[in-house]
Amino acid sequence: FYVEDFYLFIYFISLVAIFFIFFNFNYNYSSIFFSLVSSISNIGISLNDTPSNLYFIFLVLVIIGGSFFSTSSGLRFLKLYSLIKFSINELLSHSRPKHLYINKFYFSDTNIERSDLYKYFLSVLIFVISLFIVWFLLTISNIEIEAAFKLAILTLMNTVNSSMYNLSDISFFNMSFITKLILIIFMIIGRVELLTVLILCKKFLFKK
């Protein structure tokens, strides 16, 4: 898909430039760049000298994803861009009702269909609901609140936990069977996207 590839390229170049200018601590940009690529591709692997104070930014990049080297990781940058653009146009249309605002991708003749926007919004909503469910279940499984929240994000995004998220001390071996089962189930849901599961259930369970 040409439009998505173009926007992903701009997104990636922008991130590389921002990280090089603002986060190049102690001239260890190679480690930061590796963690950056690992986060936006949802691989999750990092080097030992990755700055630990950037873990929140890396988690945000994991959530956004971008389908770099992966087909279904993250919420997808293009989805979030479409929703933000639609929201801005809706606000502008109310403040300037005489102007016509078209939901269209720049540098392309492709319009953003309203039906696609509904799907994107539903995907984000389902992710937020799933995140809080996993977070709650991990918390009652005696995992510290902050660690449970990070682990919930990485589970839904199918990302390996590592030191750049400050989760290197978590041992899956010591987790209970129920906790492991919760992680496995929501990793599968995160991989195939819950919206797809709901559509399939509706197709097979509510036949005419």
For the regions a protein language model found, what residue spans apply to each?
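Membrane-proximal intracellular helices of multi-pass ion channels
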Residues: 1-208
